[in-house]
């Protein structure tokens, strides 16, 4: 399997579950951008640096990662951040977009 490097952005527990899968499969998470205390604590236990999301995020990230994963993230990421990923950016949202954008998407989809 070919491994890759990534940056993850988000503030929900789904980010940690996805990150665990990536780590188990040998992929490198370079940085997590989050304000969530549980995510920050988990990242600390596995040695992944955490930065604050928001304005100026591109200045807090080190260029050269393959993928950017935005997971259950409610903020729009600027082009300056999206373009840092050499292979692309993926938005993981737990409901069909754009019809069920926003909060509680799984419930609305039902």
Residue ranges: model-predicted function:
Residues 1-110:
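One-carbon transfer enzymes
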């Amino acid at each position: 399997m070919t491994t890759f490097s990534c940056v993850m952005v988000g503030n929900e527990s789904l980010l940690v579950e996805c990150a665990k899968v990536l780590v188990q499969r040998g992929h490198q998470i370079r940085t997590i951008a989050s304000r969530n205390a549980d995510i920050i604590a988990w990242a600390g236990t596995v040695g992944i640096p955490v930065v604050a999301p928001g304005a100026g995020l591109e200045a807090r990230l080190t260029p050269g990662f393959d993928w950017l994963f935005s997971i259950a993230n409610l903020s729009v990421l600027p082009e300056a951040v999206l373009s840092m990923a050499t292979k692309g950016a993926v938005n993981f949202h737990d409901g069909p977009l754009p019809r069920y954008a926003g909060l509680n998407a799984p419930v609305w989809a039902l």
